[in-house]
């Protein structure tokens, strides 16, 4: 390719390479609890997840939290391979039911031996941003009694769509639906959590106040003037600006996220339960079993 920069043009030769993007990250929180983020599902996610699980197990974890919040899905095979890590052989993972006359129903089952002891408690965090393959994984774990879901109901995207040539263009046609091991249709219904913990989010009434807060650069200015990301500073910011018409919990998350964005990536905590209600509830469940 030819690149034009600062008045000068020059040629570059680019070589394509296959890149395997990591979709799994992990760490230890609360001293003894394993925490895994699943950002999406690819064909490599199952292997990546297994490596992280094995690493955490060697550190003597007493429970595992898998965070699927805002995981929009991806490769269905990746979701099924991931569920295989935790389920014994012969468990239903998902069933695909086609429209009459389009395809035969297909049931997928777990294969091999579970890599994680059956007595290790597992929590999966979900919200409305958890969709498609993320829902397949969550449902397989929930319906087979291997994980407790905490958070809010998932998005509800569970269909198979095929693309056909149609005239001078193309048409996308739904040919099948995904069903959970318990026979529930995922599409437009989503997966209900076992324990409901609502997301902290802006209400419609708070949006104008939030926009003004950003326009005035209130958050970034506060962080610049108070660079220590301490709990005291975060709570002080929230208490100072509730008069702007934004809930204190929302303000807490906004300034915490600003502090995190200023940290070097390798210095950021894998998770912060201090101001995360859903994660806090997951930790409580791991500790108490209820």
Question: Where are the language model's segments positioned?
Answer:
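PDZ-domain C-terminal substructure recognizer with occasional recognition of PDZ-binding tails
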Residues: 1-25, 174-175
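C-terminal "post-core" interaction segments
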Residues: 25-65, 70-290
């Amino acid at each position: 390719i030819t690149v034009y920069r600062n008045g000068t043009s020059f040629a570059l030769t680019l070589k394509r390479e296959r890149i395997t993007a990591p979709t799994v990250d992990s760490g230890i929180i609360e001293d003894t609890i394993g925490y895994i983020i699943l950002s999406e599902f690819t064909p490599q996610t199952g292997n990546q997840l297994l490596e992280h699980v094995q690493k955490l197990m060697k550190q003597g974890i007493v429970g595992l939290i898998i965070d699927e919040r805002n995981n929009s899905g991806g490769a269905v095979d990746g979701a099924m391979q991931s569920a295989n890590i935790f389920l014994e052989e012969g468990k239903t993972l998902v069933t695909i039911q086609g429209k009459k006359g389009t395809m035969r129903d297909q049931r997928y089952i777990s294969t091999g031996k579970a890599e994680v002891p059956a007595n290790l408690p597992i929590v999966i965090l979900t919200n409305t941003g958890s969709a498609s393959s993320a829902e397949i994984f969550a449902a397989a774990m929930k319906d087979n009694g291997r994980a407790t879901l905490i958070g809010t109901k998932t998005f509800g995207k569970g269909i198979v769509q095929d693309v056909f040539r149609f005239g001078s263009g193309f048409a996308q046609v739904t040919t099948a639906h995904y069903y959970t091991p318990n026979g529930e249709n995922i599409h437009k219904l989503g997966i209900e959590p076992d324990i409901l913990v609502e997301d902290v989010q802006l209400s419609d009434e708070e949006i104008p106040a939030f926009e003004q807060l950003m326009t005035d650069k209130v958050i970034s200015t506060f962080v610049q003037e108070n660079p220590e990301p301490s709990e005291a500073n975060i709570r002080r910011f929230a208490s100072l600006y509730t008069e702007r018409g934004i809930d204190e919990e929302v303000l807490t998350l906004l300034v915490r996220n600003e502090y995190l964005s200023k940290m070097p990536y390798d210095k950021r905590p894998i998770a912060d339960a201090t101001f995360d209600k859903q994660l806090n509830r997951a930790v409580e469940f791991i500790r108490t079993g209820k």
